[in-house]
């Protein structure tokens, strides 16, 4: 959520920047009217409160003098009713202002290139050379089925489309990838591993920005009876959601920052709006595993932290010897809450292209303001909002796809990357 003071004092400038850099049309007229009315109600409630307090004191003085206090009592009661009405109207208006503010995307950093869509993203670097094959390349679906490890038909029977059943050595390889990523990030990159709930409440989803705007992308639980919103849950679309919300409503000592957390979880997404896209294989699933990286940092450290976090995700690809490229997303392709995002795209031989395998974002104070996540300096004891960052380190299913396709042999076997062999009992090939 953007700084309310920014919306109050620089509304036109913010609207202009959002339109130019995000293509987002801010409802300036409504915001301006709401702010004008808020100021009037604020003054009115403060005036009524002061007058009621003054009259209440007069009751005591009049009573001490032996005077009739009933007229004053009636006046105080009338003032109280007016104050309650004004407060209720002010509360309702502030909720309306907040509801509108929750739909406004974050402002892009000035270093982010202008652009309407992914075609205008900026390639930053490439690592590794795509392998040349002297045989017909198979895709991961064919390779996985040849190994008896990917069963999409069974998943359709159990659940439906965009799910998979993994078996045997393919399931083991999938597990090995996640374990390798966790060990790397915890033992070499300084992250603390966390086990988090896969179901979260609505307040948590508001905190990281999935609600109210992206509710249709979530899988929600449906209580059998009407219950309060606080008791309704949704499956997590990413471990970013529970990990980041661990600092919600907290005041952290600045000396304890950065906080670096990682978790391996399944992720659940409805893929609303993705009908007909990537219908074959593991690329776009309703349920997939991911190792997530989250950092909570001081505001002045967040841009450097983004570079560091992205490097941590890149290290996974480099150790697996998977060719990839690093892309800086343009303003039109960035996520709702991000101020700057790098995508890592891995080479997939069967598609003859690079595909996203990680997205690393600096959310600035956008999530922290929603969550009221703050830090306090030991020197002056003042509090300020933290900055939050997140990234995939990596998407496990897509990494499995990349390993299957990049390490395939002419006979359909899959060579196990060297760094994964200790997790596979020394196995060198699958199939």
Curated annotation (Swiss-Prot):
Residues recorded as binding ATP, renumbered to this chain, are 269-271, 356-359
Q: What does this protein do?
A: Catalyzes the attachment of serine to tRNA(Ser). Is also able to aminoacylate tRNA(Sec) with serine, to form the misacylated tRNA L-seryl-tRNA(Sec), which will be further converted into selenocysteinyl-tRNA(Sec).
PANTHER family per record? SERINE--TRNA LIGASE (PTHR43697:SF1), SERYL-TRNA SYNTHETASE (PTHR43697)
Q: Where in the cell is it found?
A: Cytoplasm
Q: Which organism is it from?
A: Pectobacterium atrosepticum (strain SCRI 1043 / ATCC BAA-672) (Erwinia carotovora subsp. atroseptica)
Q: What EC number is given for this enzyme?
A: 6.1.1.11
The pathway where this protein functions is: Aminoacyl-tRNA biosynthesis; selenocysteinyl-tRNA(Sec) biosynthesis; L-seryl-tRNA(Sec) from L-serine and tRNA(Sec): step 1/1
Q: Which GO terms describe its molecular function?
A: ATP binding; serine-tRNA ligase activity
Q: Which UniProt keywords apply?
A: Aminoacyl-tRNA synthetase, ATP-binding, Cytoplasm, Ligase, Nucleotide-binding, Protein biosynthesis
The name this protein goes by in its record? Serine--tRNA ligase
UniProt entry tagged with the keyword Ligase: yes
Task: Tell me which PROSITE patterns the record gives.
Answer: AA_TRNA_LIGASE_II (PS50862)
**So what does this thing catalyse?**
tRNA(Ser) + L-serine + ATP = L-seryl-tRNA(Ser) + AMP + diphosphate + H(+); tRNA(Sec) + L-serine + ATP = L-seryl-tRNA(Sec) + AMP + diphosphate + H(+)
The primary site where this protein sits is cytoplasm
Family, per entry: Belongs to the class-II aminoacyl-tRNA synthetase family. Type-1 seryl-tRNA synthetase subfamily.
Question: Which Pfam families did the record assign?
Answer: Seryl_tRNA_N, tRNA-synt_2b
Q: What is known of its domains?
A: Consists of two distinct domains, a catalytic core and a N-terminal extension that is involved in tRNA binding.
Q: Name one GO biological process term.
A: seryl-tRNA aminoacylation
Task: Identify the InterPro entries for this entry.
Answer: aa-tRNA-synt_IIb, aa-tRNA-synth_II, aa-tRNA-synth_II/BPL/LPL, Ser-tRNA-ligase_type_1, Ser-tRNA-synth_1_N, SerRS_1_N_sf, SerRS_core, tRNA-bd_arm
Residues binding L-serine, per UniProt: 238-240, 292, 392
């Amino acid at each position: 959520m953007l700084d309310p003071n920014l919306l109050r004092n620089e509304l036109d400038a913010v609207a202009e920047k959002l339109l130019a850099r995000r293509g987002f049309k801010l409802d300036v007229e409504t915001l301006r009217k709401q702010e004008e009315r808020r100021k009037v109600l604020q003054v009115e409630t403060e005036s009524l409160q002061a007058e009621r307090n003054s009259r209440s004191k007069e009751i005591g003085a009049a009573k001490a003098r032996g005077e009739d206090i009933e007229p004053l009592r009636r006046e105080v009661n009338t003032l109280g009713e007016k104050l309650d009405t004004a407060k209720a109207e002010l509360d309702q208006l502030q909720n309306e202002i907040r509801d509108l503010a929750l739909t406004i995307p974050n402002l892009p950093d000035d270093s982010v290139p202008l652009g309407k869509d992914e075609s205008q993203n900026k390639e930053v670097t490439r690592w590794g050379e795509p392998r040349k094959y002297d045989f017909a390349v198979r895709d991961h679906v064919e390779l996985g089925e040849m190994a008896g490890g990917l069963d999409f038909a069974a998943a359709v029977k159990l659940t439906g489309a965009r799910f998979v059943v993994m078996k045997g050595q393919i399931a083991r390889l999938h597990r090995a990838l996640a374990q390798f990523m966790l060990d790397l990030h915890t033992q070499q990159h300084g992250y603390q591993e966390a086990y988090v709930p896969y179901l979260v409440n609505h307040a948590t989803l508001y905190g990281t920005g999935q609600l109210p705007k992206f509710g249709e992308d979530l899988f929600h639980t449906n209580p059998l009876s009407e219950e309060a919103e606080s008791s309704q849950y949704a499956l997590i679309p990413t471990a970013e959601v529970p990990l980041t919300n661990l600092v919600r409503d907290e005041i952290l000592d600045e000396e304890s920052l950065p906080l670096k957390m990682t978790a391996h979880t399944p992720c659940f997404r409805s893929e609303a709006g993705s009908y007909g896209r990537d219908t074959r294989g593991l690329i776009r699933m309703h349920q997939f595993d991911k190792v997530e990286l989250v950092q909570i940092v001081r505001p002045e450290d967040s841009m450097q932290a983004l570079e560091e976090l992205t490097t941590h995700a890149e290290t996974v690809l480099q150790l697996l010897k998977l060719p990839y490229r690093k892309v800086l997303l343009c303003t039109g392709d960035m996520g709702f809450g991000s101020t700057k995002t790098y995508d890592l795209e891995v080479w997939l031989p069967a598609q003859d292209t690079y595909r996203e395998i990680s997205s690393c974002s600096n959310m600035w104070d956008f999530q922290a303001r929603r969550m009221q996540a703050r830090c306090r300096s030991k020197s002056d004891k003042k509090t300020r909002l933290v900055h939050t960052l997140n990234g995939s380190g990596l998407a496990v299913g897509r990494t499995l796809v990349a390993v299957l396709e990049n390490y395939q042999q002419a006979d359909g076997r899959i060579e196990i990357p060297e760094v994964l062999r200790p997790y596979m009992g020394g196995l060198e090939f699958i199939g």
